[in-house]
Amino acid sequence: NQETSPAYVRKMTNVAASNATNYQYSGTDIFEYRYAELLLNIAECYAAKGDITKTLAYLGKIRNRVGIPSANNYGIGTLADKYAAIEACLYERRVELAYEGKRYWDIQRWMLYSDETLSGVANTTCAKLGLAPINGTQRTGNYLQYKTTATATDPLAASRPSISVDPDAAAATFKAQLTALATYYNTNFVLTALPTPMDNVSGAAVKIKFNPNYYIMGLNTATL
């Protein structure tokens, strides 16, 4: 199902963009390939070789760029084997490259939908990486609703300005700000399930079912 979302993604977004053309055109550049992805690719290559030390080194370079403390391998911890290293790379890609259109291709190339056998060839990728197959799951969504009956169009207009989170502040201050933000959300908002599931057929929930043969992208006969 094609779903619109109330989420406002600021990443690579021009906040001054005009909707005069229904956002068909944009002057905002798209970064198709950037330095962080190069580091991710190198880390993944080392992971596939089983070189865990180099994998951690390159994942650390990525996290160091955004100011994550170096303790415990920049929060990654210890990787038991090459499969754990590969999974760590895939996780880092999900975080670093979020909203950049990369996840679809990562799922394709690592065959993460299921461990089904295709034409006698066993696929155990998910089992090896310790990941749950995507097949059988479904997208979830919730409304973030105000907990009490609103008495104004913006009932939090007065309290909201006091909430601020500054990643560059001292560690103790930053931690206190995050705690205050969490308290603010827990006090004022509640997650409410959607009346109609995001993935549905005639309003009834359906789960993802990606067949193994879908991994092979065919060519149109006209091309051949």
What are these regions (language model features)?
Residues 1-224:
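Acidic/polar-rich alpha-helix caps and helix-coil junctions
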